[in-house]
Amino acid sequence: MFFLSTGVFGCMSLAASCFERDGRRQHDIARLWARSALWFAGAPFTVIGRENLLPVAVYTSNHTSFMDTPLVFSSLPFQFRILAKQSLWKWPFIGWHLNRSGQIPVDEDGSAGLNRAIRALKAGMPLFIFPEGGRTKDGQMQTFMRGPAYIAIRARIPLVPMALIGTFELLPIHTHHFRPRPVKLVIGRPIDPSGYSIRQADELTARLRDEILDLYTRHAGPGDLIPSLATAPEEQLLESTEDQ
């Protein structure tokens, strides 16, 4: 049923893309798909920290599972753009949806995608990015890339750290079988990048990483794996060899 609903909502989204240019209807359809995905997976969700939401920001979170994306779409009450590795645009159906809904690809160089992301922010469109670039294989927090910090500094737009809790236990990367359980998204306080220069992107990345780990640790419940922290930002801006 999960894969059937994904196909149905995907077809609806592609059809909607023929009648709009801003992707708003497609985003609404994606949100319906996301909530149905969590329901089929047996994963009631909770959102903590809604008071920290901003109209325009660079939203970021840890990345532990394929179910992270449904949780983010179900939890954020507004349209946003996703930055993801360009290789996803080569996938049949998924790539078509990403392209038609206005999501932003980032290649190995990263500059074109990052510049497009900055323009989207300045036009009033929030962004969402997984700073780890790909899903964790063991539940541990991976090294963060500096792309989100770079974008926030360039655009002078706040970073909002978020922790996704329970999705790794719900559907780890090495299985296709759901393990029904509650999940939650915790939204942290915005980080103002105005005191940082581009040369301090690594410093801001480290702060972002610390904030997400702190949110996760403080709100994790029984049975939730507590991740450790990688030591340094990646040289790459966003690209990763791991699957989203």
Question: What does each model-identified segment do?
Answer:
Residues 1-46, 93-100:
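A transmembrane-helix-recognition feature enriched in membrane-embedded lipid enzymes
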Residues 43, 103, 156-157:
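Short glycine/serine/threonine/alanine-rich loop segments
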Residues 66-116, 121:
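Membrane-embedded segments
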Residues 111-244:
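Non-catalytic C-terminal accessory region of glycerolipid acyltransferases
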